[in-house]
């Protein structure tokens, strides 16, 4: 297996313009495909997840052109639901941001489509979304294991009264929200259970509004969506930088700055993961906010005990930042780490122990006490981009770290290690 050993880093300094947000890129692509008119998307993320969405849209007859660096996409909308040219199978890798929204959108009209993906995708639950779509009339079959992909979709979604379980993934609600305006009937979506990662719903509502559709949100418990609507292209749309990707650089600044400045997100960003910077500030770093930048300057870091439900992806970065904080850090309410690219709670606990940390892994929390000195270890990445990037921070000590399968960062940040090296002074 390929590996990359990062030698100890003495200091991290400088600025980085972030690649586009994965969450925003794939939502914007789907809405542009469903909309009337032509949309020019700029700062689109070039990554595995986005390529899976683009390949699917192409197979569904959507015309687009990409710039040479794949960060600009000119896409001609379909002016309504996507139509398959006959029976179709779409392979979506391990891209949850493609699988969930497409599973809903392709239930409009009378398609016959199979959605499948990598082995890990077949372990990521989708039953709550399927249950909700069926309540709205969708005709869906599980082809292998009940409640998991692959799925066969045969259209039929018309809207109506729908309940969705919000406790596992906010992407199920996102998928329903984006699809419901195109259904023939009005839809009332009721959320049962506590809604996880609420800020991701704000991204969805924000983008829908950009494409001309507004819906009534009653305290995130009930959403009322008028049927028979159309999305309209905003013309040009700039995808903001990926706030989850920013977390690694901001954390590096907190641990071994200098000052690290990330551009492409800021106080005006719609992504909830910008709140990661507040957590670093609580731990002792100095944060400066601009409209389109966040800067982090090194501070004396101390442990925290916090509910991380609002920033589940960026919270992983706090788990490795905790190795440099005084005391025991506890991250709570993070059950949904278990249904991501891998079981991130198990993976994080396992790999933190390898570098010498004392770790308690709970059902929905993790408690981390750093060692006096970090140990050099081979870090398993579980084909999970965030595991690879989180553990790169171990090199901000006097100990090297070896990352196995480093190319898994291609899911959101193909040149991550090059960018980190550019801003680093070796010890």
From Swiss-Prot:
Give GO cellular component annotations, separated by semicolons.
cytoplasm
Q: Where is the active site?
A: 313
This chain's function reads: Catalyzes the transfer of the enolpyruvyl moiety of phosphoenolpyruvate (PEP) to the 5-hydroxyl of shikimate-3-phosphate (S3P) to produce enolpyruvyl shikimate-3-phosphate and inorganic phosphate.
Q: Which family does it belong to?
A: Belongs to the EPSP synthase family.
Q: Which superkingdom is the protein from?
A: Bacteria
What Pfam families does this protein's entry cite? EPSP_synthase (PF00275)
Which reaction is catalysed here? 3-phosphoshikimate + phosphoenolpyruvate = 5-O-(1-carboxyvinyl)-3-phosphoshikimate + phosphate
Q: Tell me the PANTHER family matching this sequence.
A: AROM/DEHYDROQUINATE SYNTHASE (PTHR21090), PENTAFUNCTIONAL AROM POLYPEPTIDE (PTHR21090:SF5)
**How does the record describe its quaternary structure?**
Monomer.
| Keyword vocabulary terms for this entry | Amino-acid biosynthesis, Aromatic amino acid biosynthesis, Cytoplasm, Transferase
Q: What is its EC number?
A: 2.5.1.19
Q: Where is the signal peptide?
A: none
Instruction: Report residues binding phosphoenolpyruvate.
Output: 22, 96, 124, 171, 344, 386, 411
Cysteines paired by S-S bonds: none
What does the entry give for GO biological process?
amino acid biosynthetic process; aromatic amino acid family biosynthetic process; chorismate biosynthetic process
Q: Does the keyword Amino-acid biosynthesis apply?
A: yes
Q: Which GO terms describe its molecular function?
A: 3-phosphoshikimate 1-carboxyvinyltransferase activity
The record's annotation in InterPro entries points to: Enolpyruvate_Tfrase_dom, Enolpyruvate_Tfrase_sf, EPSP_synthase, EPSP_synthase_CS, RNA3'P_cycl/enolpyr_Trfase_a/b
Name recorded for this polypeptide: 3-phosphoshikimate 1-carboxyvinyltransferase
Respond yes or no to whether keyword Amino-acid biosynthesis is given for this record: yes
Q: Which EC class is this protein assigned? A: transferase
